[in-house]
């Protein structure tokens, strides 16, 4: 029922469910309601006259003294209550109309805020069409069931239903039954305090009578007829209590089918208010927020449209901060609002951050692919390494240079010239760029000025790989050694020797160095003592790729296998098999490993269990070797020699779409490298046969939250 109330509140806001500002509609609805009330008032009178005639009584006779429980007197009192309720409702509507005229400007602001909330909710609805269809199907099944308590949604959101609901609740004199507004009016509760005066329930209600007693209405049975209880009623009730649950439901179905509409209406008037209590407003703020914390973000946005008090709770910044933590969203950006929020509504930066990230993810998944920025440079040479951080892109090439680009404008900011051989490896942090070359040197550059700060000499062959951690960089060379450098002073601090072939990959976490080489070995080093702690043996061919998270070492080899090692003991924990060729690239995050292979497949692994979770294949799989990959909590991005960049769903392994498709793909066009941020994708493309010009493509998936 509470879920239905949320849906009602949301629908009314979307359809302009308030009566304000539409006097013609309001007048017509009042006339219709008055006609219904007159019919209801005439029916008890006819019943009374017929009953009196059958018993030989005179209609309108004075009751006998002491006849305090006279049913006619109770009926007259109820009719009076009805007229009083109508008068109160009419006067209340008049006061509301006057208040609306005074606050028309404020209402416009509220409408704008509601439109914004509707847009936020729609964004989430669009992202989950299947779940929305399931909810619609479920709602229809509930509406079409034999239950008489729940009205269809369109009837609940009608102006006539809103008015009669108000009148109905005025007839229920229990002050503990909270009026739950279905329109735009604020809740009764505007402070974060629990409502006092509630009758505590000593035990969980087991019958509807217990529920009414818990709500303080145990003695408020409304009688709409003067007929005395029929004989045998108590026996029937005892028999009813002795039946099983399914038997009771069957009996109720038969009873409802045999009732007249007025009798069904009476049931609704008694039952419905008990299930329309705004339980959230009865709780302290902390408990209310705790309850709301179990809602999905899209449900929170719907809850915010129910009433003012729920919106205040659903806008809670700490609540949305927890939602952001669950999704790995960092500190929220200071997003400009289009207007000043009305006093009483606190804008939540964390909520804005969550919605922004959701819209960005939607852009990646199915947003329009706008024409990418094209960054041309390096002529027809190969782009051998690529770095992307913030709004700065750095590309290295076998033309002996590096280029620094703006990811925003697409302009080449500067070209770093100094190497005398091709650049084959690079790293970047803040304003520092480090490059390794076939000229056997490393160079440290200032990214802002393009100045070469240090040239690091020591290796006797090509610097093939490197890894930067804070102020130190570890380089691996074809001379079979590794060197640890201080990038501030340019000094070589340590030399690690032990491999007997070219070092192809290296990882460094500030405490341990892990290296893989063409000698089939993986080694774990203590750089401070320059000692090899473990030699990880097991591969039967060259080691081409490494990942290291401080606990596990993951190595990929030309022998087609991937091995998971314990860095402390040096033991092989798992051998991951399934690829058919060289594992060219890997990424490891939170025990999830994604590997790309020259056999054109990509696999997702759980390194704790050694299981392959997904294989990214099918009719849309790559048609050639996978060259590079990146992944986050939602997506996997892969590039290939077939000239495409593909987007996959990390959890399901399903293909989503192609992000880049080169016209020369399949005939020489290659995507060599990719680097992705939260909102941008940078691709290094070209060819070795002249069919595709060497360039960088920058795709933007950011959203405008202004």
Curated annotation (Swiss-Prot):
Residues 1-157 are annotated as: Disordered. Keywords: Chromosome, DNA damage, DNA repair, Nucleus, Phosphoprotein, Repeat, Ubl conjugation, Ubl conjugation pathway, WD repeat. It comes from the Eukaryota. SMART domains: FBOX, WD40. One of its GO terms (biological process) is positive regulation of protein ubiquitination. InterPro entries: F-box-like_dom_sf, F-box_dom, G-protein_beta_WD-40_rep, WD40/YVTN_repeat-like_dom_sf, WD40_repeat_CS, WD40_repeat_dom_sf, WD40_rpt. SUPFAM superfamilies: F-box domain (SSF81383), WD40 repeat-like (SSF50978). Residues 277-323 form the F-box domain. Residues 32-54, 129-138 have a biased composition (Basic and acidic residues). Residues 86-128 have a biased composition (Acidic residues). WD repeats lie at residues 377-417, 419-455, 458-497, 499-535, 538-577, 579-617, 621-658. Homodimer; homodimerization plays a role in substrate binding and/or ubiquitination and degradation. Component of the SCF(FBXW7) complex consisting of CUL1, RBX1, SKP1 and FBXW7. Interacts (via F-box domain) with SKP1. Interacts (via F-box domain) with pseudophosphatase STYX; the interaction is direct and prevents FBXW7 interaction with SKP1. Interacts with cyclin-E (CCNE1 or CCNE2). Interacts with PSEN1. Forms a trimeric complex with NOTCH1 and SGK1. Interacts with NOTCH1 intracellular domain/NICD and NOTCH4 intracellular domain/NICD. Interacts with NOTCH2 intracellular domain (N2ICD). The WD repeats mediate interaction with substrates of the SCF (SKP1-CUL1-F-box protein) E3 ubiquitin-protein ligase complex. The F-box domain mediates interaction with SKP1. Substrate recognition component of a SCF (SKP1-CUL1-F-box protein) E3 ubiquitin-protein ligase complex which mediates the ubiquitination and subsequent proteasomal degradation of target proteins. Recognizes and binds phosphorylated sites/phosphodegrons within target proteins and thereafter brings them to the SCF complex for ubiquitination. Identified substrates include cyclin-E (CCNE1 or CCNE2), DISC1, JUN, MYC, NOTCH1 released notch intracellular domain (NICD), NOTCH2, MCL1, MLST8, RICTOR, and probably PSEN1. This is F-box/WD repeat-containing protein 7. The gene is FBXW7.
């Amino acid at each position: 029922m509470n879920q239905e109330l949320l849906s009602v509140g949301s629908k009314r806001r979307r359809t302009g469910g308030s009566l304000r500002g539409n006097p013609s509609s309001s007048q017509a609805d009042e006339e219709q309601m008055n006609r219904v009330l007159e019919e209801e008032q005439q029916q008890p009178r006819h019943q009374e006259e017929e009953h009196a005639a059958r018993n030989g009584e005179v209609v309108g006779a004075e009751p006998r003294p002491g006849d305090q429980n006279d049913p006619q007197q109770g009926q007259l009192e109820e009719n009076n209550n009805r007229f009083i309720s109508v008068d109160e409702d009419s006067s209340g509507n008049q006061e509301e109309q006057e208040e609306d005229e005074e606050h028309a400007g404020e209402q416009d602001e509220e409408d704008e805020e509601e439109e914004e909330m509707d847009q936020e909710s729609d964004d989430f609805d669009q992202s989950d069409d299947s779940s929305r269809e399931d909810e619609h199907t479920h709602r229809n099944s509930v509406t079409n069931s034999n239950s008489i308590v729940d009205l269809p949604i369109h009837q609940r959101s009608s102006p006539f239903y809103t008015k009669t609901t108000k009148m109905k609740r005025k007839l229920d004199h229990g002050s503990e039954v909270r009026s739950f507004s279905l329109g735009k009016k604020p809740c009764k509760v505007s402070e974060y305090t629990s409502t006092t005066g509630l009758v505590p329930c000593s035990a969980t209600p087991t019958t509807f009578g217990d529920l009414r007693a818990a709500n303080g209405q145990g003695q408020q049975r409304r009688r709409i007829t003067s007929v005395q209880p029929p004989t045998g009623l108590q026996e029937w009730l005892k028999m009813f209590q002795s039946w099983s649950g399914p038997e009771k439901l069957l009996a109720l179905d038969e009873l409802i089918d045999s009732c007249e509409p007025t009798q069904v209406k009476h049931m609704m008037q008694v039952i419905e208010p008990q299930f329309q209590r705004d339980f959230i407003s009865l709780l302290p703020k902390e408990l209310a927020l705790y309850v709301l914390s179990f809602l999905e973000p899209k449900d929170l946005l719907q809850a915010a449209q129910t009433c003012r008090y729920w919106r205040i709770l659903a806008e809670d910044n700490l609540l949305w901060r927890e939602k952001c933590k669950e999704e790995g969203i960092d500190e929220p950006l200071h997003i400009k609002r289009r207007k000043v929020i009305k006093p009483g509504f606190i804008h939540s930066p964390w909520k804005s951050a969550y919605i922004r990230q959701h819209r960005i993810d939607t852009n990646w998944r199915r947003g329009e692919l706008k024409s990418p920025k094209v960054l041309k440079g390096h002529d027809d040479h190969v782009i051998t390494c690529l770095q992307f951080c913030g709004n700065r892109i750095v590309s290295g090439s076998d033309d002996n240079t590096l280029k620094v680009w703006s990811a925003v404008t697409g302009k080449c900011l500067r070209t770093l010239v100094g190497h005398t051989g091709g650049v084959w490896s690079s790293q970047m942090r803040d304003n520092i760029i480090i490059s390794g070359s076939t000229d056997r040197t490393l160079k440290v550059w200032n990214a802002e000025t393009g100045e070469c700060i240090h040239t690091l000499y020591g290796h006797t062959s090509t610097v093939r790989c490197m890894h930067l951690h804070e102020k130190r960089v570890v380089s691996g060379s074809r001379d079979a050694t590794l060197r640890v450098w201080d990038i501030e002073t340019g000094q070589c601090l340590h030399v690690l020797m032990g491999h007997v072939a070219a070092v192809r990959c290296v990882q460094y976490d500030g405490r341990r160095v892990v290296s893989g080489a063409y000698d089939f070995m993986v080694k774990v080093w203590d750089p401070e003592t320059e000692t090899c702690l473990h030699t990880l043996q097991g591969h039967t061919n060259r080691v081409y790729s490494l990942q290291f998270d401080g606990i596990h070492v993951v190595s990929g080899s030309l022998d087609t296998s991937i091995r998971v090692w314990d860095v402390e003991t040096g033991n092989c924990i798992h051998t991951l098999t399934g690829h058919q060729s060289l594992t060219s690239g890997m990424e490891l995050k939170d025990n999830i490993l994604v590997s790309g292979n020259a056999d054109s497949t990509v696999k997702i692994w759980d390194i704790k269990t050694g299981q392959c979770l997904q294989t990214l294949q099918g009719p849309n799989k790559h048609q050639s070797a996978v060259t590079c990959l990146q992944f986050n909590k939602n997506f996997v991005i892969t590039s290939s020699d077939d000239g495409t960049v593909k987007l996959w769903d990390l959890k399901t392994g399903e293909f989503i779409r192609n992000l880049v498709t080169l016209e020369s793909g399949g005939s020489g066009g290659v995507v060599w490298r990719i680097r992705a941020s939260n909102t941008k994708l940078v691709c290094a493309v070209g060819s070795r046969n002249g069919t595709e010009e060497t360039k960088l493509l920058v795709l933007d998936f950011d959203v405008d939250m202004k």
